[in-house]
Amino acid sequence: MLHYLESAVPAGHYLEAVRGKSDQYNGFNLVLGTVNELFWYSNRGDGTLRLSSGIHGASNHLINTPWPKVERAKMEINRVLTSKAELEPEDLFKVLIDRWQPPDERLPDTGVGLEWERILGPMFITSPVYGTRSSTVILVDRRDRVTFVERTYSSVPEQFHDAQYHFHLTA
């Protein structure tokens, strides 16, 4: 990633290079580009996707897979965006710590069994053996000022540490 950030290589070209090495890694989703053009790539899918304007969601599968937590996150983010004149990182972190449990009949069947599907069902996962460890919010305002906040959690969403960075995008 550092190579991409320090270079002038277009996002689509960089992702083609990543694609050539992607079998060396566990499953991942990668979103990169500029504020005007974003791309998504996963080594679980068939290729690179240029993202259209709007709200997209990704979990541990392909982008916009209609899992209940992905659909709920997209709906809640849309609600926040349409109800707030000034958006703060905390507005989005409140969405990301949602522990709503989908009913069993709405859970995906990813091959891990019902007990694990229940554990993995909420946006914010808490279990003694597996859970959400961090969430990131990136806001870019109309003046190209960026607020980047990564929140690292202990075992519960109420206990966390934020790393926050502010910078200005340049051409």
Annotated model-derived regions:
Residues 1-171:
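N-terminal nucleophile
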